[in-house]
Structure formats: C-alpha cells, structure tokens
Amino acid sequence: MTVLVVTGTDTGVGKTVATAALACHARRAGIDVAVCKPVQTGTDDGDDDLAEVARLSGVTELAGLARYPRPLAPVAAAAAAGMALPSREQLLRFIGELDRPGRLTLVEGAGGLLVELGENGVTARDLAVALGAAVLVVVRPALGTLNHTALTLEALAAQGLSCAGLVIGAWPEHPGPVETSNRPALEALAPVRAVLPAGAAALAAAEFEAVSAGAFDRDWVTALAG
C-alpha cells in the first residue's frame, strides 16, 4: 500500500476537490485507489467530504472514522459534541485497515497540517511520520499563499517528510496580477502537480473526470502507486 496524505495551507483551499481529482485520475489509470477522511466536522451543516469525493471521482473505496456535528476545528467540534477525538492508535489502525498490495490510499486531513486530529495533539503531520507517507499540499493562488505554503513546507521538512508537490485548489477563470505572479513563485517552492479551476466541485461527474484527466500527469500518478 502507498499512503499519500493530502493537507492544505488552510481550511477551504480545496483539499476535498483535489483529493477527488487525484482519486478520479488514479481510477481512470486503472489504479486501485481508496480515500479516507479520518475526522469530519460540520456534519449538521451537511458537510460530507467523502460523499463529495464519491460523487466527483467515482471511487467506491471510502472510509471515515470520526464525525462531529459542529463546523469547528476537530478539538472544538469534539468538545461541543461531548465526544472524544480518536487516539493515535485508532487513527493508524483505521488507515492500516485499508491496506492492500498495489493500492494507493489518499488520507485527507482537516484544515492545515498542524491541526489536531486526535487525542494528545496528534496531527496530520504525525500520521504521515508514523506511516512513512509523503504529503501533497493544496494551496491557494491568492495573496498570502507564498508565506502559508513556505511555512507548511518548513513544517514538513522539520520532521523529515517528503512533499509530493502542490495542487492549486481553485484557479480563477480570470486571474489577476496576484495569481499570475504567485503561480511561478509557488512552482519555485515545490512542484505544482495540478491546477484545478475554481468551481470544479459544482461540475457534473463527467465534466469533473475530464478536468481531473487533464490536471495531473499520468506518469506521476502511476508512480505514486509504486
């Protein structure tokens, strides 16, 4: 099994759409792909990232562990619900149960890299370290993204983690000077693996499949699965 952790520089940067696009591309390439979302918040507001991944990507191997009603950070959402966060051991066992030779397992975090997902401050970075997984970082194209991206990459490097690259999660239809200048600057920080159009989540499945097919390099995706 190859595990790839998908994180973002912030919440709302397009992690779920990026995860769905990569999963869709992998499925089309004939790769056995699974997607897991260990911690989901905001279920009372209808947030269901795995359902969105299923609708957009056509992937059927989906798994979730902990779900909390309020649209808050996991620690606050768990406290508001009177529930516990999963332990480190539960999180790792949950991901490990998806294990299968030749499978690509995408693990979508919640918020950014250092947001607590589990008891005792466990983060997506901690999971990546324990799993020996590379991390794909979803970024904004807007003002402020260079600092946020550099900080995320620095946090990965501090634990010896490999960055699998960047995905620009929502490229505007009419980019301005900020976006057009940030794009090469992001590419100088780490390889940009895909640039997804703003509004991709609203596309029909067939349209989204076409977008995902053109967004990623097929050889890179195939190499992810080993």
Curated annotation (Swiss-Prot):
Its EC number is 6.3.3.3. One of its GO terms (molecular function) is ATP binding. Signal peptide: none annotated. It holds the Pfam family AAA_26. Mg(2+) binds at T16, D49, E108. Its main location: cytoplasm. It catalyses: (7R,8S)-7,8-diammoniononanoate + CO2 + ATP = (4R,5S)-dethiobiotin + ADP + phosphate + 3 H(+). CDD domains: DTBS (cd03109). Keywords: ATP-binding, Biotin biosynthesis, Cytoplasm, Ligase, Magnesium, Metal-binding, Nucleotide-binding. The keyword Manganese does not apply. It is an enzyme of class 6 (ligase). It is found in: Cytoplasm. One of its GO terms (biological process) is biotin biosynthetic process. Belongs to the dethiobiotin synthetase family. Homodimer. Catalyzes a mechanistically unusual reaction, the ATP-dependent insertion of CO2 between the N7 and N8 nitrogen atoms of 7,8-diaminopelargonic acid (DAPA, also called 7,8-diammoniononanoate) to form a ureido ring. This is ATP-dependent dethiobiotin synthetase BioD. It comes from Mycobacterium avium (strain 104).
